[in-house]
């Protein structure tokens, strides 16, 4: 299985990206293609692994317009990585760089699965019982009801195909569980979800993201991105608070010793580096977007996520699921 990795994208590129790619090769045996500046790769790569390199002299900067950058920088590392998937030289692409540029490159080079108007970024987050798929987390800040319907279908298929959930429960993120609560968007979407080909349990609130009540939570990218980053911020704040309390005096330090192992496990469960990256669902190929602050561990796990999507034929499964909806006339006029 060949995974193309954009080594120039991310806050800690290229060193941490290369380290993560090499770790994935050593641990799981992936065939990784390093895409980026050849001199930078030669400086940090382990020559003993002899990983193939694809030259990409250009880099999309974080302050650049995604569409403009992709058009003006055809030799950028993210564009080249996605092109390897299009050309069949790689089975998937991974990037921790500019999310918008990765999204644009994927749309321009790979195209959308037929019937998908808006691809969505899906993040796997921990809950009390296992994992929850949250989508969209930022690819689409404004969505029509039909877009959210497709998000629900794709998220359900991802949970079933990749995470192994037999019958994923899908919830619509709103401000109350009652069908009458929400904004114009959620009120319009609710009846569509009731007729959708997945197990819709109704509206869910923010607290249900981590409760395990549902396996998939659907929202637009504006709400999803805020929800995800709020969760990350809460975890960081709690971790700092615990450290501060423990450090106050020697009694606190001694009393905390029995709980260190437990706290370490809790931290691991909520550590974004454990989950790697977010697959871009709805494009005609496997593309995984990793966190901009990804270290080697996060990159390694993003490659694992990409490999799981390829192994389970996620793209084909989504195409089939969306095709069934189209044939049954469940699509909406507003997209």
From Swiss-Prot:
Alphabetized UniProt keyword annotations: Cytoplasm, Lipid biosynthesis, Lipid metabolism, Phospholipid biosynthesis, Phospholipid metabolism, Transferase
GO biological process assignments: fatty acid biosynthetic process; phospholipid biosynthetic process
Compartment(s) where it occurs, according to its Swiss-Prot or TrEMBL record: Cytoplasm
Gene source species: Desulforudis audaxviator (strain MP104C)
Entry protein name: Phosphate acyltransferase
Pathway(s) the chain acts in: Lipid metabolism; phospholipid metabolism
Primary role: Catalyzes the reversible formation of acyl-phosphate (acyl-PO(4)) from acyl-[acyl-carrier-protein] (acyl-ACP). This enzyme utilizes acyl-ACP as fatty acyl donor, but not acyl-CoA.
Assigned EC number: 2.3.1.274
Cited InterPro entries: FA_synthesis (IPR003664), Phospholipid_synth_PlsX-like (IPR012281)
Quaternary data: Homodimer. Probably interacts with PlsY.
Enzyme class per UniProt: transferase
Nucleus keyword on record: no
Family the UniProt entry places it in: Belongs to the PlsX family.
Entries under Pfam families matching the protein: FA_synthesis
Keyword Lipid biosynthesis carried by entry: yes
GO cellular component, one term: cytoplasm
Organismal lineage: Bacteria, Bacillati, Bacillota, Clostridia, Thermoanaerobacterales
MF terms (GO), sorted A to Z: phosphate:acyl-[acyl carrier protein] acyltransferase activity
Gene3D superfamilies: Isopropylmalate Dehydrogenase
Catalytic reaction equation(s): a fatty acyl-[ACP] + phosphate = an acyl phosphate + holo-[ACP]
């Amino acid at each position: 299985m060949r995974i193309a990795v954009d080594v120039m994208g991310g806050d800690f590129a290229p060193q941490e990206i290369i380290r993560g790619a090499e770790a994935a090769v050593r641990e799981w045996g992936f065939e990784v293609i390093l895409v980026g500046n050849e001199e930078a790769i030669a400086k940090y790569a382990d020559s003993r692994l002899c990983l193939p390199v694809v030259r990409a002299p250009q880099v999309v900067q974080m302050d650049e317009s995604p569409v403009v950058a992709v058009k003006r920088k055809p030799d950028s590392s993210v564009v080249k990585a996605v092109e390897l998937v299009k050309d069949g030289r790689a089975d998937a692409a991974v990037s921790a760089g500019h999310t918008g540029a990765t999204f644009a490159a994927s749309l321009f080079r790979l195209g959308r699965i037929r019937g998908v108007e808006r691809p969505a970024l899906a993040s796997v987050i921990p809950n009390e019982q296992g994992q929850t798929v949250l989508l969209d987390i930022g690819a689409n800040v404004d969505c029509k009801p039909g877009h959210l319907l497709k998000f629900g279908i794709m998220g359900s298929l991802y949970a079933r195909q990749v995470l192994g959930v037999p019958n994923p429960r899908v919830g619509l993120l709103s401000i109350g569980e009652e069908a009458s609560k929400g904004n114009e968007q959620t009120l319009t979407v609710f009846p569509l979800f009731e007729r959708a080909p997945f197990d819709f349990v109704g509206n869910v609130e923010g607290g249900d993201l981590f409760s395990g009540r549902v396996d998939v939570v659907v929202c637009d990218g504006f709400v999803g991105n805020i929800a995800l980053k709020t969760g990350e911020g809460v975890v960081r704040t709690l971790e700092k608070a615990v450290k501060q309390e423990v450090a106050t005096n020697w009694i606190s330090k001694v009393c905390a010793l029995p709980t260190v192992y437990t706290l370490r496990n809790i931290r691991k469960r909520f550590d974004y580096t454990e989950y790697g990256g977010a697959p871009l669902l709805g494009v005609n190929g496997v593309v995984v977007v990793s966190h901009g602050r990804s270290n080697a561990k996060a990159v390694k796990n993003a490659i694992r996520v990409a490999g799981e999507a390829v192994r389970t034929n996620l793209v084909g499964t989504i195409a089939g699921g969306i095709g069934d909806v189209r044939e049954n006339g469940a699509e909406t006029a507003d997209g």
